[in-house]
């Protein structure tokens, strides 16, 4: 191990550490960071060299953050990234600094976003918040309105997590929806992601995603928002049901084909009575 460490440059060590951090399971960033910190044994190198990994993790995971003085949490996403460590809260029309390591928001200030699309953004956000409240016990959503390639675009992000470290599991749901505001009809594009880590009796991760495409009728802001939510709800319900059914089927078939739950005798060995078994007697007489 010592020879391997001598062969690795600082750049290679940081690259490996960054990979560990970016792939940390939901809710386990601190544990992975602390382990990597011990392995690297160089805090300055880790902070400077792997800072991009801290940021990438939060962007990928849609990390929710509470801003002091404001009621609702906002998601850290690439769509709200203003550069130089600043992020947008479109609902409250503010920008703020975000510490990717501490996961803290500071220095909130007024910020004027795209006014041309604001009425559409607000309508979608109102409808989406009602939907999230109904379907996600710990859900957070952020809706952005911006011009992309000259087109007015709505981007809706949803995050919901359950961190149950005491019960040895953590999980996160993320979904991102996007459509442009064009006359008559437009295309809705979405991606749904689930990541769950279970580590009580082993180390199992579920990492799944699904791409969605559907057409949306564009009329006024409120009606379009309602139709958009119908698409979101139908797709997310279908995805959740498919995941549940798939893993129930896998439990009933694939897992059982890989390993017997009981020995061939169909009974579990009582290790306290091992001497009463033939093998126990043979061992005793040996």
UniProtKB/Swiss-Prot annotation:
| Translocase is among the record's keywords | no
Q: How does it assemble?
A: Component of the F-actin capping complex, composed of a heterodimer of an alpha and a beta subunit. Component of the WASH complex, composed of F-actin-capping protein subunit alpha (CAPZA1, CAPZA2 or CAPZA3), F-actin-capping protein subunit beta (CAPZB), WASHC1, WASHC2, WASHC3, WASHC4 and WASHC5. Interacts with RCSD1/CAPZIP.
GO terms for cellular component: brush border; cortical cytoskeleton; F-actin capping protein complex; membrane
Keywords for this protein: Acetylation, Actin capping, Actin-binding, Phosphoprotein
The record ties this protein, via Gene3D superfamilies, to: F-actin capping protein, alpha subunit, F-actin capping protein, beta subunit
InterPro entries recorded for this chain?
CapZ_alpha (IPR002189), CapZ_alpha/beta (IPR037282), CapZ_alpha/beta_2 (IPR042276), CapZ_alpha_1 (IPR042489), F-actin_cap_asu_CS (IPR017865)
Task: Write down which residues bear the modification named Phosphoserine.
Answer: 9
Q: Which GO terms describe its biological process?
A: actin cytoskeleton organization; barbed-end actin filament capping
Please indicate if the UniProt record lists rRNA processing as a keyword. Answer: no
Q: Which Pfam families match?
A: F-actin_cap_A
Provide the family line.
Answer: Belongs to the F-actin-capping protein alpha subunit family.
**Stated role:** F-actin-capping proteins bind in a Ca(2+)-independent manner to the fast growing ends of actin filaments (barbed end) thereby blocking the exchange of subunits at these ends. Unlike other capping proteins (such as gelsolin and severin), these proteins do not sever actin filaments.
PANTHER family recorded for this chain? Answer: F-ACTIN-CAPPING PROTEIN SUBUNIT ALPHA, F-ACTIN-CAPPING PROTEIN SUBUNIT ALPHA-2
The N-acetylalanine modification is found at: 2
The record's annotation in SUPFAM superfamilies points to:
Subunits of heterodimeric actin filament capping protein Capz
Molecular function as annotated in GO: actin filament binding
Name the record gives this protein: F-actin-capping protein subunit alpha-2
